């Protein structure tokens, strides 16, 4: 497998990134590791990074419909998911749905996330996976696995999972999938992946070969693409 890049960070859009970063830091027991006016990074207990990007014209997802659908969500492991869900609501989340061993909530910016029971996790929460919606979960999993040098570790009717270097990305099969159409403000991105590469030209060639499309924007240290499902992502150097 040819490795082009490494998953650096997943970034969620929001109109109030200080509020959103503080929410996840307090809820999950994570650390705010970097703070700029338009970008705040939170580091998990095992060193993974989640960022919050300022988007003044942010349009929140309206789960579970597909008119303005969720695009990404976080799956968080916690020991005592019901108590954690109550605490999340107290911090500004909204309870959306209950499963057998998980609760789906919306964070203060409207992004859905799942709290999933896992015995022995703590004291902070554990990031199990970033989950990305797709019309063909297996195909999108293979795209990112090849792009980031990860392995497809699960494929099933509900989705697919890739893993590598201590990180996991899940792809959720969605019927009547409605993609983002960045930079169209009527169909904006809600989140994106930053993938680090040693060489932007070589990284771009590999991404295009695998089925990505080049989008507007970029600079000396990053370029913007859409994956085969329409989700924007950045290659960074």
What positions do the PLM features span?
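Short, structured interface segments
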Residues: 99-121
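Short hydrophobic/aromatic beta-strand micro-patches
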Residues: 11-13, 75-77, 131-133, 194-196
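Core segments of cupin and vicinal oxygen chelate
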Residues: 2-56, 83-84, 90-98, 103-104, ...
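Short beta->alpha transition motifs characteristic of CBS
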Residues: 115-121, 173-175, 235-237
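Eukaryotic phosphotyrosine signaling hubs
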Residues: 7, 70-72, 189-191
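Solvent-exposed, charged amphipathic helical/linker segments at domain boundaries
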Residues: 117-132
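Residue-level recognition of short loop/turn positions
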Residues: 46, 107-109, 227-229
């Amino acid at each position: 497998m040819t490795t082009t890049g490494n998953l650096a960070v997943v970034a969620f859009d929001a109109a109030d990134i200080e509020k959103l970063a503080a929410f996840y830091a307090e809820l999950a027991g994570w650390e705010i590791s970097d703070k700029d006016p338009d970008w705040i990074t939170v580091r998990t207990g095992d060193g993974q990074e989640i960022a919050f990007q300022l988007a003044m014209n942010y349009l929140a997802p309206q789960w579970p419909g597909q008119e303005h659908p969720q695009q990404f969500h976080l799956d968080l492991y916690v020991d005592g998911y019901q108590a954690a869900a109550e605490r999340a609501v107290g911090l500004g989340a909204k309870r959306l749905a209950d499963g057998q061993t998980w609760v789906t909530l919306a964070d203060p910016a409207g992004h859905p996330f799942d709290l999933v029971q896992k015995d022995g996790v703590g004291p902070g929460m554990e990031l199990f996976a970033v989950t990305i919606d797709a019309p063909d979960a297996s195909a999108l999993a293979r795209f990112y696995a090849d792009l980031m040098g990860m392995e497809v570790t699960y494929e099933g009717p509900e989705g697919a999972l890739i893993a590598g270097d201590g990180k996991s990305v899940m792809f959720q099969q969605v019927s009547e999938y409605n993609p983002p159409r960045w930079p169209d403000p009527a169909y904006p991105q809600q989140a994106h992946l930053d993938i680090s590469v040693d060489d932007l030209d070589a990284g771009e060639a590999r991404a295009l070969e695998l089925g990505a499309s080049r989008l507007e924007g970029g600079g000396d240290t990053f370029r913007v693409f859409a994956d085969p499902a329409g989700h924007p992502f950045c290659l960074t150097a």
